[in-house]
């Protein structure tokens, strides 16, 4: 879900407004034991997530995928091992962005009546699903079994006249690229 922050910051005026107050770039790394890790770099103009532990301002290790899911659900409070001086970013900017992401990803029926909001919610849900497909193929035992049968190449995953993504398969490892493939 956190990878969808990229798209939120790109597509949503409220998220852009939240980031506009950022004085300098801040990067946050989530490192899940026996699970995925990613580093998200935030700037005034948006954010970018990269797989893996990268150079970061804030480092948050998590002991399991369940703990990470708890962080996402708000039932687990993460404890940074690095970046305590940047706690203000986590408590204000990061929390405001994730709250906005939750608002868009778990919309009320009333909010969905607004066509622009409906389209934003649909796009963000699509991008969340596209990234989840790769994560499942790489991290889940059944997903890994399925990926073991996949040939190298690009898979087009899209909504007609809407958002598109490429699921790139290389040596049974899946990567999501948030654009339509050149040669599906």
Where are these regions (language model features)?
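Long, compositionally biased, glycine/small-hydrophobic-enriched stretches that function as flexible linkers
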Residues: 27-29, 52-55, 60, 66-79, ...
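Acidic, aliphatic-rich amphipathic alpha-helical segments
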Residues: 1-39, 80, 84-164
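Low-complexity, glycine/alanine/valine/leucine- and proline-rich hydrophobic stretches
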Residues: 37-73, 158, 162-184
